[in-house]
Swiss-Prot record:
Stored NCBIfam families: rplV_bact (TIGR01044)
UniProt protein name: Large ribosomal subunit protein uL22
Record keyword rRNA-binding present: yes
Assembly: Part of the 50S ribosomal subunit.
The species this protein was found in: Alkalilimnicola ehrlichii (strain ATCC BAA-1101 / DSM 17681 / MLHE-1)
Amino acid sequence: METSAKLKFSRLSPQKARLVADQVRGLPVEKALEILEFSPKKAAAIVRKVLDSAVANAEHNDGADIDALRVARIFVDEGPMLKRIRPRAKGRANRILKRTSHITVTVAEQQ
């Protein structure tokens, strides 16, 4: 049984979020949570919250055994960009793109 959780419009660059997502893909949930807890990256705390939510969904909705869960799929999609302007010399301006992410975590019981 697979259960998932999504976080949309997270103010985090998809490139940075994917670095953390790649570290926990395919691991047992317990080990993945340990890795995320001790990672110094901002993305680790955000991904950890989504993983906790997926585990809670599996336990509450499907009655899954938490000890038997693993991270079946985790992927980060790009969300809409917030466009900001940085003033430059001589009346010019540069555009700054504040990127957002959609993070999806799917957990499943190990076979």
